[in-house]
Amino acid sequence: MSKYGDSMKIVWTNGCFDVLHRGHFEMFKYAKSFGDQLIVGIDSDEKVRNDKGPSRPHNCVEDRKFALECIKYIDEVVVFSSREGLEQEIRQLQPDVMVIGSDWKGKNVVGEEYCTELKFFDRIEGYSTTSILEKSN
C-alpha cells in the first residue's frame, strides 16, 4: 500500500534539473495533470558528474532539491545516486504514471515495469539546460 493511500494517484518523473527553465516547468505541470501526487527524483551531484561531465552540475543537489520543492506542482523530491537507486525508488513507490521525455520512446526506461502507465513529454523547442549553460560561458 502506498504511503499516500490507495485512492491517491501517484505520478513519478526524474532527471538532473540542474538549471531550471520553462521546459521543466511545463513538464511538471503536464505530469501533475495525471495524478494527485507528483514525486520527482533527482540525480545526485556524483551521478550528474558521471553522466554529463566534470563541469556539471552547475547547482549542487541541495540547491536543486530546494528549488524543486518550491514548485507548486511537485509534492515530494527524492535524491538517487545510481541507476539501481533510481530503480529501487520507483519499485518502492509503484507509481500509477511515469512521465519521461519523448526522446526515451523505444528505449529501455528504468523502472518502467513498476508503473501502470508511461507518458511521454515532448521537449519544448528552444529550452535546454545545456544550451543555457553554453550561452552563459
Question: Where are the regions a protein language model picked out?
Answer:
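Nucleotidyltransferase catalytic core that binds NTPs
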Residues: M1-N137
